């Protein structure tokens, strides 16, 4: 991920409010849960597609390097695309 994409991803992730709520991605509805911990140093995000078995899961450590993204059991590109292209 280049610096511009990293910055955009970080910004979009921070803009998402903590809690659980519906979002849309590729015309599908997901229940997204976001939790910010350790005074903003760790962001946990999980989204479960409603009506199917797709999901998104990631941990993001904002203060490690330029931000360290750790997807859970899926490609980094999948979680980046989800965060950048979801709508609330």
Label for each model-derived stretch:
Residues 38-78:
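Acidic, aromatic-enriched beta-alpha/helix-loop junctions
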Residues 1-33:
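Negatively charged, low-complexity tracts enriched in Asp/Glu with abundant Ser/Thr
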């Amino acid at each position: 991920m280049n610096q511009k994409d990293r910055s955009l991803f970080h910004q979009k992730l921070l803009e998402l409010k903590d809690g659980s709520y519906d979002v849309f991605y590729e015309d599908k509805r997901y229940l997204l849960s976001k939790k910010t911990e350790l005074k903003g140093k760790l962001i946990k995000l999980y989204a479960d597609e409603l009506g199917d078995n797709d999901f998104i899961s990631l941990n993001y450590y904002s203060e490690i390097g330029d931000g360290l993204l750790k997807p859970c059991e899926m490609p980094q590109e999948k979680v980046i695309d989800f965060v950048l292209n979801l709508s609330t």
